């Protein structure tokens, strides 16, 4: 029996992941070289098709785990990209997500197997299809949300210096922050806690290490840096 569904065209649905990391003062993006056509050998975001019995959210989590080995990662849906000719291979509608990961925690063997590499956000090579638009939109969303919620801590190690914290937000916003004002704002946030540990990698004197107390933040969810 012909049904309403049978008489309408069917499309592929995929997910693409914009994976952000932070290292040495730079916001970075994890990219891979495609090993299949179309656009074989070109730089691309990590993606995959949504499988039977799988939600788009679950598909994005699976794709991220397949590339990095990480689970329970902060992810946010960026939007749906569905131009008719966006993929020259087939009609594919893609749902894009951005993810924030600690760059020291991912599975390097998996990343190597996928021929993936980190690129600095301001030095991204040409990307396939509409992936540049996905990255641009994801970065705008990241900047907006990072200004009002403490999502940036997902990019930092559990213990960090104030220099690292300021460098992170400078990388996210794409502009320098006044050191004095930044330190003053940190002092006003009781959920950024100073520990008794010292980081001596930069100097003999060292720098105090801080941590983000999520429970304290949830009691008074106010953030600005």
Question: What do the PLM-derived regions correspond to, one by one?
Answer:
Residues 2-43:
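N-terminal strand-loop-strand
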Residues 11-15, 58-61, 65-108, 123, ...:
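Active-site segment of metal-dependent pyrophosphate-handling enzymes
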Residues 26-70, 147-166:
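Conserved Nudix-box catalytic region and its N-terminal flanking loop in Nudix hydrolases
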Residues 29, 33-34, 40, 47, ...:
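Short, His- and charge-rich active-site/binding loops that engage polyanionic ligands
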Residues 98, 108-142, 146, 155-163, ...:
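NUDIX/MutT-family hydrolases
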Residues 167-176:
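Short helix-coil junctions and helix-kink-helix linkers
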Residues 196-225:
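Long, intrinsically disordered, low-complexity Ser/Thr/Pro-rich regulatory/activation regions
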């Amino acid at each position: 029996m012909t049904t309403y569904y049978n008489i309408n065209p069917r499309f592929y649905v995929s997910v693409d992941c914009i994976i952000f990391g932070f290292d040495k003062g730079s916001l970075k993006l994890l990219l891979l070289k495609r090993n299949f056509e179309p656009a074989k050998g070109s730089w691309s975001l990590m993606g995959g098709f949504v499988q039977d019995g799988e939600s788009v959210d679950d598909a994005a989590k699976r794709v991220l785990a397949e590339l990095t080995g990480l689970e329970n990662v902060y992810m946010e849906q960026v939007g749906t990209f569905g131009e008719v000719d966006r993929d020259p291979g087939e009609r594919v509608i893609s749902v894009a997500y951005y993810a924030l990961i600690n760059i020291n925690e991912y599975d390097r063997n998996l990343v190597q197997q996928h021929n993936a590499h980190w690129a600095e956000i301001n030095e991204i090579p040409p990307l396939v299809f509409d992936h540049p638009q996905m990255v641009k939109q994801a970065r705008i969303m990241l900047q907006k949300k990072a200004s009002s919620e403490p999502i940036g801590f997902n990019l930092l190690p559990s213990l960090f210096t104030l220099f690292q914290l300021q460098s992170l937000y400078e990388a996210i916003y794409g502009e320098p922050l006044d050191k004095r004002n930044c330190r003053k704002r940190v002092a006003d946030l009781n959920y950024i806690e100073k520990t008794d540990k010292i980081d001596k990698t930069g100097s003999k004197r060292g720098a105090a290490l801080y941590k983000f107390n999520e429970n304290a933040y949830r009691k008074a969810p106010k953030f600005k840096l």
